[in-house]
């Protein structure tokens, strides 16, 4: 049943790559109520606009977050993503990179001293950062959705459309709002972040990751917290929560096989699920 649902979902995702290999800047995901859609690793940072319906999202350090019609949020490059339709939903996805300036003095690639980075505890308690889509922006997004699904947008036209979206974000939202939603992307250490995501695997621990980065523990820990906003151990644990949930929801792997994937015993995996995901593995499927 899950494989059938996944295939249906895949068929309703407009193309992500052009024939010449360039990534599509916009694509549309249609997902039905009860249907699952997942990505093990997102290749590009994404702006996600929920145009219709309601979904349950797990991505990065956030687990089982609800995103409703009229809301937008960010999925970060290198993160995994799991989406479940709570209602029939339409999501417009727009890829971007760290050079995309949002307003004067505030770009995704440069931190600013004007705003305080949230603590790890604040990140967890506040949940996935999201903003309401204002009516003027929603009108443009629905037009783009229609153009994408009608195959009317070439690459250059998509670049122009993305520029319009960026301009509208800069015009309709203030710096505080943009910082709130893009705060994790606005790391001033993109090279370090990308290198961490390159070496990251589902079974790695903080000590092994530090060794691959060829840094002293003190330097690695300092730079990791600056780039990701929390200690490495907390980040790895949060990532594991999302990945275990994806494995339970979207694969036919046994509990023993899932535990082996993360170098855990089945009993430890059961305790992990009860503690962090709220139930035993069999009930989470």
Indicate where each model-derived feature is located.
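N-terminal positioning helix adjacent to the helix-turn-helix/winged-helix DNA-binding module
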Residues: 136, 161, 184-192, 228, ...
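Recognition helices and adjacent regulatory flanks at domain boundaries
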Residues: 166-186, 193-198, 208-211, 219, ...
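Basic, amphipathic alpha-helical hairpins
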Residues: 142-157, 168-178, 191-205, 224, ...
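A short, N-terminal "cap"/entry segment at the start of jelly-roll beta-barrel domains
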Residues: 1-20, 150
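N-terminal regulatory/effector-sensing and dimerization cores
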Residues: 18-121, 154-155
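Amphipathic alpha-helical segments enriched in hydrophobic/aromatic residues interleaved with Lys/Arg
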Residues: 109-168, 194
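Basic/polar phosphate-binding segments, predominantly the helix-turn-helix DNA-binding elements
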Residues: 207-239, 251, 257-284
């Amino acid at each position: 049943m899950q494989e059938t649902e996944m295939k249906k979902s895949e068929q309703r995702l407009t193309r992500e790559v052009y024939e010449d290999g360039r990534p599509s800047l916009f694509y549309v995901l249609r997902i039905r109520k009860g249907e699952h859609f997942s990505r093990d690793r997102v290749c590009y940072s994404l702006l996600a606009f929920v145009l219709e319906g309601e979904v349950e999202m797990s991505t990065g350090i956030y687990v089982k977050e609800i995103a409703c019609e009229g809301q937008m949020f960010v999925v970060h490059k290198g993160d995994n993503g799991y989406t479940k339709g709570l209602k029939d939903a339409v999501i417009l996805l727009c890829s971007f990179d760290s050079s995309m300036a949002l307003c004067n003095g505030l770009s995704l690639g440069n931190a600013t001293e004007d705003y305080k980075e949230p603590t790890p505890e604040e990140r967890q308690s506040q949940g996935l950062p999201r903003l309401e889509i204002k009516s003027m922006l929603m009108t443009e997004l629905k037009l783009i959705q229609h153009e994408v699904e009608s195959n009317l947008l070439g690459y250059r036209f998509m670049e122009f459309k993305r520029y319009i979206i960026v301009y509208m974000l800069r015009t309709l939202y203030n710096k505080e709002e943009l910082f709130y939603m893009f705060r994790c992307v606005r790391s001033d250490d993109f090279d370090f972040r990308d290198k961490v995501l390159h070496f990251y695997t589902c079974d790695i621990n903080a000590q092994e990751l530090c060794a691959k980065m060829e840094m002293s523990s003190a330097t690695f820990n300092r730079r990791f917290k600056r780039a990701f906003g929390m200690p490495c151990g907390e980040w790895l644990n949060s990532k594991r929560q999302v990945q275990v949930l994806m494995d339970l929801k979207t694969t036919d792997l046994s509990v023993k096989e899932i535990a082996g994937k993360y170098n855990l015993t089945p009993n430890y995996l059961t305790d992990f699920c009860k503690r962090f995901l709220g139930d035993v593995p069999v009930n989470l499927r």
